[in-house]
């Protein structure tokens, strides 16, 4: 029979709960022997500890969604157990070893001390923990219900924007509904704890007063004997009931005060957040030391605390820094291997391969060996990331730097996703001049010339800075020139750095300030199209920091225009003032215009399809137009004139694509992007 029952339990674990409920009902009616009461008291304590530990280690509130039901069952079990122990106390003046031991241990030689300790435990549970948890549950339930419509709308918006699919939306709605029901259940379930605490107090007085009366009238005890016996039993019974109740109350407090969204358990979150800020640790350490110096205070106690906090401070600042560096080293494998004609294998070996992420490292800079100082380079990279965000509104991923024995002293190589993307010649011990000046040769200043994107860069020793200032040469530091070249390389490959996930992260922050605007944009544009718009803007050196203006433009034009390329042109027109401010000099924009013949030739080559528009010119016409443009643009470049190409709005993107291979650094703008506050200086019409 037992074997059959165990087999049923293994397939139907709910039978355990059913048996427990039947046992609780039986405890209300049937008198129990003391040894069985001891077992049930021990079971009650262990169950309370089990619930306490379970609530402590949950990672989100839905991980313990059965807690209100568990709370009801444990409360009923505890009250039924109190009835059984009260029956034993009043009838036999004996409630088992556990209750007697608890009472004797707490009371000791003083009944007054025992009452005080028991009163403190009861007050802490009833007034502090239970009342606080009850209030938190009430507020959480109200806010959960009030926030449901907004959360439902957010799920619908994500579904329309293509961020989630129908299955994901269904799962989110299910989670939202379960959370709302759970918070509502908590609001009522906390009344169980409150009622249990009140019932426990009443049972204590009944056992004490009734026990003394029964002891004197039925058991022939003296007043002092009855008072001593029943006080020990009453306080012992109260403690074995209140301690599990206290653990359950704390468990309820843990769950209702937990904030959803954290991936770790509560203990880990508490430790990481309290001790996560090194500055707080060192300040607290100093204050602890100062308190220890006050007259009459035990200095050694506070000194020990201060030393512990200081040790934690150094652990955070030094050990974790080294740990982060080692983790960044192992985040991806950037090594190479060579295969030669020898018989020996030269395949690379990676230690602990399974622990390494399969993702590539987004950005790596390779320097020549013995060329970089770690502290200086970390500072420079952080300044580059900060300036790039200021200039273009994009947060770059962490940039790692490595050394290579294959590079020349002043060579730097940029790897994007561990593949070579660009290289630079930067002389960090010199200054650079970006415009050629004949007076430099006349002064006899030694110059090292390099080029980047058709720009000739002259590098001069720092000692000649004063001489260069006297001839009005445009001087730039090596760090600034490195940032300029690196930023251009990053923008040329922006599609690999800034994609849908980065766009989503940016829009999540934007939604906190402009939720209605973003909701309107998502009605007509998916996040994929928004990402493409931002990529195209960044690819032509246009900042996306003014995201509000970009979203306003998308909200205006997206309902009428489905072609992403055309949408970009409308966004560029809305950013005209910012585009002009970047290319103008003293309020003037120097431009080169295209003749009607060339514009018509390009316009005739545009083809419209369901997938969008593209340029498909005849080879002869394309070569003729390209040669004409190349010849004229090269002449202007040789004349050292800074200019942009000004064309009609309908062909701007196609002209940019046409000249991109030969003249990538030349900006192409349309008439719609000229702000009325700026004047146009036409250098030439091609």
UniProtKB/Swiss-Prot annotation:
Any one Gene Ontology cellular component term annotated for this protein: plasma membrane
Membrane topology classification: Multi-pass membrane protein
Main location: membrane
Keywords: Cell inner membrane, Cell membrane, Membrane, Plasmid, Protein transport, Transmembrane, Transmembrane helix, Transport, Virulence
The organism of origin for this protein: Shigella flexneri
Protein localization: Cell inner membrane
Membrane spanning stretches: 28-52, 105-129, 197-216, 232-256, 274-292, 299-315
Protein role: Necessary for the secretion of IPA invasins.
Family of this protein: Belongs to the FHIPEP (flagella/HR/invasion proteins export pore) family.
A GO biological-process term: protein secretion
Protein name: Protein MxiA
Record gene name: mxiA
């Amino acid at each position: 029979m037992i074997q059959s029952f165990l087999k049923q339990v293994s397939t139907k674990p709910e039978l355990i709960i059913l048996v427990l409920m039947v046992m609780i009902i039986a405890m209300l009616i049937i008198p129990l022997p003391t040894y069985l009461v001891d077992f049930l008291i021990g079971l009650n304590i262990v169950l309370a500890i089990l619930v306490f530990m379970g609530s402590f280690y949950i990672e989100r509130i839905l991980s313990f969604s059965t807690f209100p039901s568990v709370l009801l069952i444990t409360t009923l079990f505890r009250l039924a157990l109190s009835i059984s122990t009260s029956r034993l106390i009043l009838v036999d003046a004996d409630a088992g070893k556990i209750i007697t031991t608890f009472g004797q241990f707490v009371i000791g030689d003083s009944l007054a001390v025992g009452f005080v300790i028991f009163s403190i435990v009861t007050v802490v549970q009833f007034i502090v923990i239970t009342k606080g948890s009850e209030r938190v549950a009430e507020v959480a339930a109200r806010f959960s219900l009030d926030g449901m419509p907004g959360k439902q709308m957010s799920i619908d918006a994500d579904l329309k924007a293509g961020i989630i699919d129908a299955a994901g939306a269904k799962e989110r709605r299910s989670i939202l509904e379960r959370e709302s029901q759970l918070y509502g259940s908590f609001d009522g379930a906390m009344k169980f704890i409150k009622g249990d605490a009140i019932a426990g107090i009443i049972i204590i007085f009944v056992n004490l007063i009734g026990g003394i009366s029964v002891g004197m009238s039925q058991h022939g005890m003296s007043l002092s004997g009855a008072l001593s016996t029943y006080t020990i039993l009453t306080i012992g019974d109260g403690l074995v009931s209140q301690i599990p109740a206290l653990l359950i109350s704390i468990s309820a407090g843990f769950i209702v005060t937990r904030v959803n969204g954290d991936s770790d358990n509560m203990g880990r979150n508490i430790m990481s957040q309290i001790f996560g800020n090194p500055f707080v640790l060192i300040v607290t350490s100093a204050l602890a030391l100062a308190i220890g110096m006050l007259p009459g205070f035990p200095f050694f106690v506070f000194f020990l605390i201060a030393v512990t906090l200081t040790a934690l401070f150094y652990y955070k600042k030094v050990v974790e820094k080294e740990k982060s560096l080692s983790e960044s080293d192992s985040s991806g494998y950037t090594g190479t291997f060579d295969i030669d004609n020898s018989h020996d294998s030269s395949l690379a070996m990676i230690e602990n391969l399974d622990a390494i992420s399969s993702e590539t490292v987004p950005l790596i800079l390779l320097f020549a060996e013995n060329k970089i100082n770690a502290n200086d380079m970390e500072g420079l990279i952080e300044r580059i990331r900060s300036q790039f965000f200021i200039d273009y509104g994009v947060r770059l991923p962490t940039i790692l730097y490595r050394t290579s024995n294959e590079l020349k002293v002043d060579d730097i190589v940029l790897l994007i996703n561990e593949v070579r993307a660009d290289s630079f010649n930067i002389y960090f011990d010199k200054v650079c001049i970006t415009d050629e000046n004949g007076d430099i040769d006349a002064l006899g200043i030694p110059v090292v010339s390099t080029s980047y994107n058709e720009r000739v860069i002259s590098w001069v020793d720092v000692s000649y800075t004063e001489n260069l200032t006297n001839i009005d040469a445009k001087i730039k530091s090596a760090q600034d020139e490195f940032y300029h070249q690196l930023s251009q390389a990053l923008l040329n490959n922006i599609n690999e750095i800034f994609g849908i996930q980065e766009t989503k992260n940016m829009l999540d922050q934007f939604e906190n300030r402009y939720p209605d605007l973003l909701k309107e944009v998502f009605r007509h544009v998916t996040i994929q199209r928004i990402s493409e718009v931002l990529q195209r803007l960044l690819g032509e050196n246009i900042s996306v920091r003014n995201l509000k203006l970009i979203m306003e433009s998308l909200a205006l034009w997206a309902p009428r225009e489905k072609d992403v390329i055309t949408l970009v042109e409308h966004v560029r027109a809305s950013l005209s003032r910012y585009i002009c401010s970047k290319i103008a000099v003293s309020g003037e924009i120097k431009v080169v215009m295209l003749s009607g013949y060339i514009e018509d030739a390009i316009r005739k080559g545009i083809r419209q399809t369901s997938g969008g528009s593209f340029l498909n010119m005849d080879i002869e016409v394309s070569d003729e137009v390209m040669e004409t443009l190349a010849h004229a643009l090269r002449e202007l470049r040789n004349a050292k004139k800074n200019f942009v190409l000004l064309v009609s709005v309908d062909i701007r993107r196609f002209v940019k694509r046409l000249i991109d291979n030969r003249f990538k650094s030349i900006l192409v703008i349309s008439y719609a992007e000229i702000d009325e506050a700026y004047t146009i200086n036409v250098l030439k019409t091609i």
